Structures are given as C-alpha cells and as structure tokens.
C-alpha cells in the first residue's frame, strides 16, 4: 500500500460537478472587486476568509451571491475559470465539465456573451497550455420560474459549440424537477445532455422526477436516493451516474460526520458514483481534498479510489472516441511498470 495522499495525488481525475462561481477564492474576489471599483463588506482577505467558515446554508448563499457581484467583464470570467483550471491541473485533473449559472449574472445586467466568452476562452487556453480539457454545463436556477429558464436556453443556443449540457441547481426544497419539464424537453430536442441536482436536501421522489420527467443523463448529488430501495435498484440497473460532493455535504450539514457519508453505502449498493468538489473555495477543498477526505473517513482502499476516479471519465459526456482514449490513458497510467 502506498502512502494514501500520494496515491490520490497521482490518480488521473475528471471533475463533473464544479460550480465555477463557487471556486472564487478570497484573494481573487478582492482583486476583481478592486479592478471593478466594488467595495466589499470585508476589510481584508483574511476577514473574508474567516467569513468562509460559515455554519448555515444561508450564510453560504449570502457569500456566494456577493462573490458573483464582482464578476463584471469577460476578463473577470476568464480569470475565474483560469484560476480554477490552473489549480486543478496541479491536482492531476485531466477533464472538467464546468457548471455556470448565467441567470445569476444576466439578472445583474451582464450579457450572456460576456460570461460565456470568458469561460470558453479560459477552457480553450487550458486545453492548449495545460492539457486540461473541459466543457460547460449551463445550470438553471430552480428558485426562478420556467419562463426565465426558457429565455436563458434561447441565449445558449448560439453557444452549442461550447455548452455541452443543461443542468438544474440552487435551492432544491420546494422546487421539484417537474417545475422545469418543458424547458428540459426542449433542451433535449436541441441536443444538450441533461443533469439535475436532486436528492441532496430534496426527497427521493425528486430523483424519480429528474429521471422520468426531465430525462436526465446524470444525477447531481443523489444522497437521499438510499432512502428508497426501488430507486437504488433503478439507479444501479440503469448505471445512472451520481456526482457526489463529500466536503460540500459536510459543510452544508447534509451529513454531520464524513464517517456517515452515504458514499460507502452507494458503492456497496453497486451505484455508479463519482467524487467532486461542488463549490471548492467555500467548502474547504478541491478534488484531491475530497478524495483524501473520503479515503480517510470511509477507509476506501486503493482499488475503490481507483474505481471512483475512473468513473469520473466513464460518466463524462465526452464523445465516445475521446472517452475511450481517456479511459485507456487512465488504465495505462496506473498499470504496474516493469
């Protein structure tokens, strides 16, 4: 057995559940605020970092939306994405499907093209300079209405070359997937892959709705699926990927102790699970930190860690030929060397 942290570090990884706005570190938030003439409610980077030690969901959301307010120009969005991509490159992340929340910006008067162009330019530079490949997944904010989501989808159509999928995030409880069935149907017709946050705080039937009414290709979170044996059987039978976010679940009190995180039960139930960081700047860890956390808390062995990391590539929306090449590269990188 190699050193656990070293084993995690050398694993090639893909990240499928990362909200790019949630990667905004305090230093960059201050830099962008200064560049755009915005006064933050904190006197220093250290004071802001202390505020990141929140204990309630609302405290997180307040910080999250304040962070969004410093993003004004295409260069701001580029810098945000580039900072994340450079950081995860150092963690041996090879591929990313990056969530972004356009409604959180267009509602502030920021043009859709401003954010989309900045993010796509960063992804292109990361592929060329870092060999980190990535695509965008546009997420609708579920606390807004479906008509607003429809308008956002209209704006996304000009960016189908760079936006791979459509997702659903924000406050889950009280906003079931069924609220968005029409816009998801249209997104599917337009050729987008589909994902949705479901079963994090919301009940298991939200996962059923995401599967049967939205027709998603992947479930984001899905923790509470374990409360419904029939749902677990369905997820296992269909090999439906779940993008699990351990440190996020801990910080938002979805679980009170990582030793009781459902990832272990998911694996034991034969579910197709990936590990991800969600909003890493706010939740205390990027992808490697999430892997190390569950390795320690759940006593995952190297074979399990390897399988979960491989799942990240297998569950991705890469074209089949790219996926086959990525999986072959993953397997060869971990083969014993003579």
Predicted segments, located by residue:
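Short HxH-centered metal-ligating active-site micro-motif
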Residues: 197
């Amino acid at each position: 057995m190699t050193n656990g942290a070293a084993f995690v570090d050398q694993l090639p990884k893909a990240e499928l559940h990362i909200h790019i706005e949630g990667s905004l570190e305090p230093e960059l938030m201050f830099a962008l605020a200064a560049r755009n003439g915005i006064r933050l409610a904190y006197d220093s980077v250290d004071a802001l970092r202390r505020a990141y030690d929140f204990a309630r969901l609302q405290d997180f959301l307040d910080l999250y939306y304040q962070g969004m307010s410093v993003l004004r120009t295409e260069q701001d969005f580029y810098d945000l994405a580039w900072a994340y991509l450079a950081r995860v490159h150092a963690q041996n992340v090879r591929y990313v499907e990056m969530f972004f929340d356009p409604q959180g910006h267009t509602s502030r008067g920021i043009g859709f093209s401003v954010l989309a162009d900045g993010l796509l330019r960063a992804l292109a530079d990361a592929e060329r300079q870092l060999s980190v490949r990535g695509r965008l997944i546009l997420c609708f904010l579920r606390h807004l209405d479906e008509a607003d989501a429809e308008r956002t989808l209209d704006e996304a159509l000009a960016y189908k070359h760079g936006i791979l999928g459509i997702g659903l995030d924000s406050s889950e409880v009280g906003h079931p997937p069924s609220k968005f069935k029409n816009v998801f149907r249209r997104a599917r017709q337009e050729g987008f892959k589909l994902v949705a946050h479901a079963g994090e705080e919301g009940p298991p039937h939200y996962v059923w709705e995401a599967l049967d009414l939205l027709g998603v290709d992947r479930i984001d979170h899905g923790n509470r699926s374990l409360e419904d044996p029939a749902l677990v059987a369905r997820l296992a039978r269909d090999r439906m990927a779940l993008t699990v976010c351990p440190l996020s679940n801990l910080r938002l009190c979805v679980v009170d102790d990582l030793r009781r995180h459902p990832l272990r039960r998911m694996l034991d139930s034969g579910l197709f699970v990936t590990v991800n960081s969600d909003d890493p700047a706010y939740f205390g860890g990027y992808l490697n930190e999430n892997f190390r956390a569950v390795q320690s808390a759940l006593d995952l062995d190297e074979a399990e860690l390897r399988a979960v990391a491989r799942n990240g590539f297998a569950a991705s929306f890469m074209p089949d030929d790219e996926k086959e090449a990525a999986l072959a590269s993953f397997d060869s990188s971990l083969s014993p060397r003579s």
